[in-house]
């Protein structure tokens, strides 16, 4: 049987589309973001999924249980965060370090009063 190039191309395209349609018909995805939905069903973070579920072994009744309807994040003792007594430079350094951009993480500083050989230690307490 002799086939022309056009016939071969049409046959290949038809088989490809038919097999793709058969695979799509077998899946039980209800939307076009099936991978995200599967990830959410498995407990993974999937922002584009139709439904995000709590991680395994987490009771939804234990989330946000302090009874405060205020949208401000609170410390475990219920107090808000304040920077009383901090200079602008200390606040800036604190913010930078929280973002993972601590400007002087390896700088040796005096972490105490200098009596207990603490002058030559790093900010994390090590001496190397």
UniProtKB/Swiss-Prot annotation:
The keyword Signal applies. Residues 24-44, 52-70 have a biased composition (Low complexity). Residues 24-128 are annotated as: Disordered. Residues 71-82, 113-128 have a biased composition (Polar residues). Residues 85-110 have a biased composition (Basic and acidic residues). Coiled coil: none annotated. Keywords: Signal. Residues 1-24 form the signal peptide. InterPro entries: Uncharacterised_YbgS. This is Uncharacterized protein YbgS.
